[in-house]
A protein has these predicted regions:
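Active-site-adjacent betaalpha module
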Residues: 3, 10-128
Length: 128
């Protein structure tokens, strides 16, 4: 987050998000995931990757019609992104082994809902 006011209600609900302040170690891209000059990195402050970003405009400009979603948490950011992706008419795939949640029951329930309503849930082997 760039300031104490950004996403204040979201951060009040989930205080651990306060560890994600701009410039801190908790927001660095893992060095095992190399980022080149040609890559586009999007900064987000809310659950969905689409909310208050230009991700949809950029994806459409690139001719993208399908997304593979990975990340944390299944019940939060992953689900919100999958729902918004569907609303923007993307074919959405969530890789079950590449998402997680602090609550195993919430993880399973959200994968079930995503598969039933918003996209496809698969294993990494299914992507090939």
């Amino acid at each position: 987050y760039e300031s104490d006011d950004e996403a204040a209600v979201f951060r009040e609900k989930i205080p651990s998000l306060n560890a994600l302040m701009a410039g801190g170690d908790n927001v660095l891209i893992d060095s095992r995931l190399p980022v080149s000059a040609e890559d586009r990195v999007f900064r987000k402050a809310h659950a969905s990757c689409f909310f208050a970003t230009d991700l949809n405009v950029w994806l459409r400009g690139q001719g993208v019609d399908s997304l593979v979603v990975a990340g944390f948490t299944t019940s939060g950011c992953v689900r919100a992104t999958a729902v918004d992706a569907l609303q923007y008419d993307y074919r959405t795939i969530v890789v079950a082994d590449a998402v997680g949640d602090r609550d195993p029951a919430a993880h399973r329930a959200n994968l079930y809902d995503i598969e039933a309503k918003y996209g496809d849930v698969c294993s990494p082997a299914d992507l090939t």
